[in-house]
Curated annotation (Swiss-Prot):
Protein name stated in the entry: DNA polymerase catalytic subunit
InterPro entries: DNA-dir_DNA_pol_B, DNA-dir_DNA_pol_B_CS, DNA-dir_DNA_pol_B_exonuc, DNA-dir_DNA_pol_B_multi_dom, DNA/RNA_pol_sf, DNA_pol_B_thumb, DNA_pol_palm_dom_sf, DNA_pol_type-B
Effect of A102T: In strain: Nonneuroinvasive mutant HF10
Lineage: Viruses, Duplodnaviria, Heunggongvirae, Peploviricota, Herviviricetes
Quaternary context: Forms a complex with the ssDNA-binding protein UL29, the DNA polymerase processivity factor, and the alkaline exonuclease. Interacts with the putative helicase-primase complex subunit UL8; this interaction may coordinate leading and lagging strand DNA synthesis at the replication fork.
Amino acid composition bias (Basic and acidic residues), ranges on this chain: 650-661, 676-691
Amino acid sequence: MFSGGGGPLSPGGKSAARAASGFFAPAGPRGASRGPPPCLRQNFYNPYLAPVGTQQKPTGPTQRHTYYSECDEFRFIAPRVLDEDAPPEKRAGVHDGHLKRAPKVYCGGDERDVLRVGSGGFWPRRSRLWGGVDHAPAGFNPTVTVFHVYDILENVEHAYGMRAAQFHARFMDAITPTGTVITLLGLTPEGHRVAVHVYGTRQYFYMNKEEVDRHLQCRAPRDLCERMAAALRESPGASFRGISADHFEAEVVERTDVYYYETRPALFYRVYVRSGRVLSYLCDNFCPAIKKYEGGVDATTRFILDNPGFVTFGWYRLKPGRNNTLAQPAAPMAFGTSSDVEFNCTADNLAIEGGMSDLPAYKLMCFDIECKAGGEDELAFPVAGHPEDLVIQISCLLYDLSTTALEHVLLFSLGSCDLPESHLNELAARGLPTPVVLEFDSEFEMLLAFMTLVKQYGPEFVTGYNIINFDWPFLLAKLTDIYKVPLDGYGRMNGRGVFRVWDIGQSHFQKRSKIKVNGMVNIDMYGIITDKIKLSSYKLNAVAEAVLKDKKKDLSYRDIPAYYAAGPAQRGVIGEYCIQDSLLVGQLFFKFLPHLELSAVARLAGINITRTIYDGQQIRVFTCLLRLADQKGFILPDTQGRFRGAGGEAPKRPAAAREDEERPEEEGEDEDEREEGGGEREPEGARETAGRHVGYQGARVLDPTSGFHVNPVVVFDFASLYPSIIQAHNLCFSTLSLRADAVAHLEAGKDYLEIEVGGRRLFFVKAHVRESLLSILLRDWLAMRKQIRSRIPQSSPEEAVLLDKQQAAIKVVCNSVYGFTGVQHGLLPCLHVAATVTTIGREMLLATREYVHARWAAFEQLLADFPEAADMRAPGPYSMRIIYGDTDSIFVLCRGLTAAGLTAVGDKMASHISRALFLPPIKLECEKTFTKLLLIAKKKYIGVIYGGKMLIKGVDLVRKNNCAFINRTSRALVDLLFYDDTVSGAAAALAERPAEEWLARPLPEGLQAFGAVLVDAHRRITDPERDIQDFVLTAELSRHPRAYTNKRLAHLTVYYKLMARRAQVPSIKDRIPYVIVAQTREVEETVARLAALRELDAAAPGDEPAPPAALPSPAKRPRETPSPADPPGGASKPRKLLVSELAEDPAYAIAHGVALNTDYYFSHLLGAACVTFKALFGNNAKITESLLKRFIPEVWHPPDDVAARLRTAGFGAVGAGATAEETRRMLHRAFDTLA
């Protein structure tokens, strides 16, 4: 680091030289440099500003870098509210012009140029070079032997473009005429940033020699090179016109196609290519009739796999290469990156330093941006493409990743900003650095300063909350679209690098983005949190409360424009809000340590961290399989036509981005979109989601015996079921055959497995005939995981965390293998393998059921196998019966046995079954024993485990969509069922009889406490003094309202109401709160107006909703024409509104005293209870609701407005009313007496 200081510490930014507000003020002591005189403030363009149309591109930087190192004019956009001396009518909108001067920054009473490098800078700097000038101290010449690599880049260099005198001949040979260069980016133990350029890596692909010679009449490898060069020169465009045969090298090798056992070794041309672009073109276009192999493997993967031991994340050592050649240090003026030291070498100059496992002092940047719309509607959501919508503040926290220490807190502010003293004192009390407030006159200057910090400080890791989908896209769109700033030099590369965000499709209707920045690993904590934990809301405040037990001082979006316009002190409140967001995200980062698990996966899979984050599970398994296949003499084909489904054509190049992820449950739509019957449905059969097409039958479950079980239920789990099936039965591409004649020379059962899958006979040879590649991978991974886990107890706390992340990474990759084979459009699909795994899994469930029922049908049989069972006997008849089987779990209901005894002997029972039925390494384990179990349906149950802990699977007692009142009541009912023995006994008796019987008789006496909860709930719902906050429901806005097929959704109603009231409308992925109100005349009128607004919004082009000003008033609505059935005079009876039309914003309902719809809420409560407790009544929801209603007092409950009018008139309620169940009991006793 060449400038460790963060500049003068600014106490909240109170400075003599102030941004923006001072810029627009009359000339002060600083003279003309402070801005135009007051009389010129109205047009703002003189003396410095010119019309936008005359804007010229800033003077280009020097040829060796493309980042801004100098700038003397720029587009100036700033909000007029910063002109604090102007009258109110002049402070709306923005100034937009062109300014001729260097960009400025103000801090702590000082002013300086943003791009100037010198001592006492306002932010820390680690870059050695800036603008082609070496700023290293005299004598700086660090010795580099060992360095840690965290990112790997690749690019193509041309010999004619290089200065031969600067390069060793071996490097020139590697790029003559062109060649791929791999760049390793990392850090030394001393903290020096290193870039090592590795020459000589070549990509290659394979083609069958016999096919090539037959199609192209080749007699030697050189002939093939000539044919390929000719094909490239004849391709459209001028890209390949200079290609010659010297660009290629071909050799003949013996390899075997990985598909099918009967495939035998053959001769292949291995064609080396010097450019990935050429490779892609050849594989896609050169002789399509000839199959290509491994053409999609990038240069970085080749570098890692072709050099045994090399890793994408770990320690390397420089060493002498062949013929004692050494790595060549690069001269600073020839650096291509912003590193401290650069070397040129070949792969033989590198070795892995296996003895080091800790991380060097990498830097982490955590940032957050605040934006504000600048048009007529300041409450509109900002759009990056609108020049008037501005970034107003950026908080930036800089951590040392190895020590977790927060080293710098920076706040970039458009306009002057004074942080509150209370915030500064709070940070000081926590031992955190005092924030450095950097103030700017214009948005461009602030954004340029931020990007200059990114370049000069160069954090290796960056995090934030939803930065991939919002913060980075917004910033980059501003810089490129509005200010025309080239970004290719702002990563670690000084030019020709990558710094971009792009969309990678939709997941659960959410637009997903991907960011790639050379030398900067972006880890979005929003994605990490949504993957790791399940919450009802993923807003940062909700996550902080749930995970950190902390909460932030929230600032309403509606308040930001007023705070921003109010002056430096109120802008400081926004700054505090911005900083605390980054602080919370930093805490989340160091709680989950996502970089450790991601780097462990990257290291295991042989891919860099960025691919680990964005490219899904497929690429991880593919790369590992590629490595092993090469060792065993196999090659992997590129073609995807081998296992096409009935209806689809596989793409030539399947995207590897998350295509193997299972579709998540439609959160927010499972109830919300079905409410009015217009929700979208997924078709039956094979489904295709987010690039994943599954064309085979999934794992079978044994249908559950629904009901409430108060006898012990033992749950046996298969340990790593699918990986163990693959290992036990030697399943693989290479062991599969579809032809009986291919295995005719082998002995059935002994040498191969024969199995029928989907009506077709498949054959898999045993391991002694040919060992499965997938099995080898799994065996090695699991052995590695076992060894790592064994080291954890003896490790230091820091090392234990790292080891735990490593073993978790191995588990993730192991569990990806089955899915890897089952994705039809994946990188290497084999649906036969995937379908065989699930078929064997189904057979194992059935075999286990038959074995348990036959082997332990009588207690004496159980006693013979387990003598200790004599002490397990409980009162009542004995039986052992499987009541549910779910993919890898088996539920065994054990009557006449104690839960304690079953818990003690469970592992022995599981081992007994494993030995009797399954091949190793398949094994059953006793996971738990339920003392009580409410088995509702497949994958839905609630139970109490021996010891008292409750386990809930597939049943959301606390649903995101339900209100707090319903969630609390549902939980209270469940607790009663499981922890009140009287209620449990009554419920068990209830479940043993057919549900229809209870329609004609009273419910068991023991359910009275259960009914009391429902009675109390009914009372609270109908209480006029109830707290409305308890009845707030929420639903996620999963996409823009116009994109919904079903428009009759409650949360969409509230969205349009907010828009009509010019309130802040929610963003996509926000959860919209609402309450259901009673139908009144005012509500009916509002619904009519909303219908018009929906029509306007549906017709509006673009991404933004129609302006609220377009909403017609009720008086302008067309008069409805009376129908013949209407009463005379045309006055028709008001229709009953849909529930979704009765949705209202809770804040509005509270402020205006809008009455709630009590009937809806109680029906909703009964519906929620029925979903959980219908298992007591044979899963008959209609009977369940009918019986639960017996507990409700039979009284008339008028609407709230009617009840209020009755009370005002002096009427009062008479009697509490009896419940239907009480009435039924009285009548039952009366008839018994009369009888």
